[in-house]
Amino acid sequence: MPIIPKLECRVDTFREDGAVFMRIGIHQEEMLLAYYAFDTLLTGFADKIALHDHENGADCEIVLAPAKLTTDAQISLTENDIECIKKLLHDCIEQPYYVSWLHDDLTAATKAGEMDLAVYVVGKTEQ
C-alpha cells in the first residue's frame, strides 16, 4: 500500500465481497489527492477509481486497471494517462463529487458540514 507523508487515510471494508476502500483525509491539496489516487493504481493496490455524484446518486467508473495490468500486476500509465487522471480528479474535487462507492453515513457527515470532500479508492479484494 502506498504511503504519502502527511496524508491521513484509513482502510475500511464495506462490501460483502471484501473489497477494500481507502478513505483519504479531506483538507489536503488537490494535487496530493490526485497523486495518491493514481499512485494506488501504479502500485497495483487499486482496481479502479469510481466517481460518485452524491447529489444525483450517479456512479461513473474510471476503470484503468483491467486494461493496463501487466503480468507483474503493475499498471503501466503513460504521461498522458496520468495527466488525464489528474484532470478528472481535479475537476471532481472542484465540484461536490466523491471518488468512491459511497457509504450512507458519509453523506450525513458531509451534509452536516463535518467534511467537504472525501476521496475513496476502490481497492483489490483481499484473498
Positions of predicted regions on the chain:
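Positively charged, low-complexity terminal tracts
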Residues: 1-127
